[in-house]
Every structure is written in C-alpha cells, then in structure tokens.
C-alpha cells in the first residue's frame, strides 16, 4: 500500500446487516480525525477466498470477520496466530504490505478486558468459573480465563460431547459438566459466564436453575440484546456483580483498529452509545 492511499478496513460476513462494527469503527474514525474508511461487506462462503485475496490489492489494511466465516478464514490466511488456533476461530485480519494475510482472534482480549473493567474487584485466583456453552465464544473465554489464572473451569453445554471436546483441548483445568447439572456448579463459583445465544432477543430462554447465585459471585453474559438479560436480572437481584456483554464487543475491536489506523481508541460511554 502506498503511503498516500487512505487505509480501508471493513467487516466480512453473511449476512452482514446486523453487524455493529461499522457504527463503532466509524465513530472512532470521526472522533480521532483519522483519514480512513470502514465498510460492511456481504460475502458468500464460496466467494470468501477470492474476495479476501483481492482486498490487499484494493488498499485494505485489514478486516473483521464474523459469522459464518470465522473458522473457514483460517484455511485461507497465510498465517494464523497461536491464540486463533487455540480458539478455533479468527475474527481479525491483518494485511501486510506484501499481500500476506494474518488471521488473529481478539475475542478473548475483549472478554477479559470487559470483565476487569466491569468487575474491578474480581480476582481470577479466588475460585472456579462456571461457563455455559461450548462454541467459538466459549473457547475465547476459557483461553482468557486460564491465562488470567482461574484455577478451575466448569464447562457445561446442551450437547455434552462438545463440552468434553473443548475441555480436552484446554486440559486438566477444564471439566465438562452435564447441562442438567448446570445449576449445581454455580453456588461455589466466583464467576459465571454465559457464552450461548440463550436469552438473546428472538432466541430461547436460558433455562438453568439460578437459585445458587449470591453476593460475591460475578456474573457476565455475552448476549447484549437485550443489554440486561434474564440471567443478569436474576444475578442483580441476588446481589451479584453483573457485567453486560456490550463491552466485550467494544474491547475486542480495539486491537484491530489500532493496527489498521495507527490510533488506539478509547472504550467509553460515547463508544457504547454509538452502537446502541
């Protein structure tokens, strides 16, 4: 890319109309007076490789990747970071000047940064964490919790085989628990995390007994529509510290924006308002 070319970035998905990323990145571009563009791109799975290969030649410096391309993009990239390999998905692309494509994953960074911001008194080493769900988001959460020093993680999923598979990936600190037992691994947890879509507007409810919630537990939900899910409402009523999922979306975008546009953006109330 020549020095006088305006840097381009965007988000690739199918569909893409739901993505909040354009609103957020355009807010930051305007806030910091950065000369750059960020655009949503609807890309069908069969066109993914040809589009991504063409992007560096068109002046793109990188892109975010969302459903359904977060796994398949790893097969296309020239290099995949270790954390993206561990999480089994990539959400951020960096295009080098020679055209090389690097796939990374910033979801774990976004999760743990949001958690520390929303629950500054939470101590990773204070006790076990209970995690609902065994999809890509779950892997990012687990990786970041292990790195933070959480001693034990109880992973529960509606399909037990998926929970066992993820647990085996991460080793002895992660134990798979039957979904019907989910309510029994809450009371002595220091942290409870929902990584499923259950509780999201238009999705089924998270039907897990929550009577084990009490003050001293931090509860966070990756769902941010609605912003206060039934899980967070119940946790708040039980005296827990609650952290909504919007901050993860904001924080995971920071590393990519900084890399592409040379400005580290701040996650603040204005950024939250930009995507609500």
Swiss-Prot record:
Question: Is Secreted among this UniProt entry's keywords?
Answer: no
Q: Name one Pfam family in it.
A: Shikimate_DH
Q: Specify which residues bind shikimate according to the UniProt entry for this protein.
A: 19-21, 66, 91, 107, 224
What does the record list as GO biological process? Answer: amino acid biosynthetic process; aromatic amino acid family biosynthetic process; chorismate biosynthetic process; shikimate metabolic process
Q: What Enzyme Commission number(s) does the record list for this chain? A: 1.1.1.25
Transmembrane stretches in the record are: none
The catalysed reaction is: shikimate + NADP(+) = 3-dehydroshikimate + NADPH + H(+)
Q: What highest taxon heads this organism's lineage?
A: Bacteria
Q: A Gene Ontology CC term for this entry?
A: cytosol
Instruction: Identify the catalytic residues.
Output: 70
Q: Which residues bind NADP(+)?
A: 82, 133-137, 157-162, 222, 245
Q: In which pathway does it act?
A: Metabolic intermediate biosynthesis; chorismate biosynthesis; chorismate from D-erythrose 4-phosphate and phosphoenolpyruvate: step 4/7
UniProt KW keywords:
Amino-acid biosynthesis, Aromatic amino acid biosynthesis, NADP, Oxidoreductase
GO molecular function per UniProt: NADP binding; shikimate 3-dehydrogenase (NADP+) activity
Role played = Involved in the biosynthesis of the chorismate, which leads to the biosynthesis of aromatic amino acids. Catalyzes the reversible NADPH linked reduction of 3-dehydroshikimate (DHSA) to yield shikimate (SA).
Among NCBIfam families, the record links this protein to: aroE, PRK00258.1-4
Q: Which family does it belong to?
A: Belongs to the shikimate dehydrogenase family.
* HAMAP family in alphabetical order: Shikimate_DH_AroE
The UniProt subunit note reads as follows: Homodimer.
Looking up PANTHER family in the UniProt record yields: BIFUNCTIONAL 3-DEHYDROQUINATE DEHYDRATASE_SHIKIMATE DEHYDROGENASE, CHLOROPLASTIC, SHIKIMATE DEHYDROGENASE
Q: What is this protein called?
A: Shikimate dehydrogenase (NADP(+))
């Amino acid at each position: 890319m020549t020095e006088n070319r305006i840097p381009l970035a965007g988000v690739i998905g199918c569909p893409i109309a739901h993505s909040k990323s354009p609103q957020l990145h355009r807010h930051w571009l305007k806030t910091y007076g950065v000369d750059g563009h960020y655009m949503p791109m609807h890309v069908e799975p069969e066109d993914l490789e040809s589009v991504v290969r063409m992007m560096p030649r068109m002046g793109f410096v990188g892109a975010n990747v969302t459903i359904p391309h977060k796994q398949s993009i790893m097969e296309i990239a020239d290099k995949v970071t270790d954390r993206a390999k561990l999480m089994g998905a990539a959400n951020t692309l960096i295009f080098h000047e020679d055209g090389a494509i690097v796939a990374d994953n910033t979801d774990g960074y976004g999760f743990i940064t949001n958690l520390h911001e929303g629950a500054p008194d939470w101590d990773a080493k204070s006790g076990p964490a209970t995690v609902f769900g065994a999809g890509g988001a779950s892997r990012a959460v687990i990786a970041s919790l292990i790195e933070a020093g959480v001693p034990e993680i109880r992973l529960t999923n509606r399909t037990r085989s998926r929970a066992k598979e993820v647990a085996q990936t991460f080793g002895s600190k992660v134990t798979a628990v039957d979904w019907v037992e989910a309510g029994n691994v809450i009371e002595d947890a220091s942290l409870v995390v929902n990584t499923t879509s259950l509780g999201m507007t238009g999705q089924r409810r998270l039907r897990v007994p929550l009577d084990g919630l009490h003050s001293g537990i931090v509860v966070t939900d990756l769902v941010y529509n609605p912003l206060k899910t039934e899980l967070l409402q119940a946790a708040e009523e039980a005296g827990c510290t609650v952290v909504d999922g919007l901050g993860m979306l904001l924080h995971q975008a920071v590393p990519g924006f900084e890399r592409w546009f040379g400005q580290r953006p701040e996650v603040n109330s204005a950024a939250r308002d930009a995507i609500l």
